[in-house]
Amino acid sequence: MNKPLILVVEDDAPVRSLITTTLRAHDYRFLSAANGESAILEASSHNPDIMLLDLGLPDLDGVEGIHRVRTWSNLPIIVI
C-alpha cells in the first residue's frame, strides 16, 4: 500500500527542507510549495491526502488558504 501523499506548504526554505528531508527518510510521498498560490495549485492538481500548512505565508494568509481549499475539498490540513 502506498503511503499518503503529503503537501508541505512552507515559505522558509530551511524549514521546508527539514520537513521534506524527514518525510523522504521515512519513504513518504510528498509535494512542496513555497507560497499559498502554489499550494492551492498543487492541491487542486495532485489531490494530496493531507496538507501541512504554514499560516504565515507571504502571498496568502494561511487561514485564507484553508478557506479557499474548503470551497472544493475536505483535505485534512495540519497547521505548522
Protein language model features and the residues they cover:
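The feature encodes the CheY-like receiver
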Residues: 16, 58
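Conserved phosphotransfer cores of two-component systems
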Residues: 44-46, 68-75
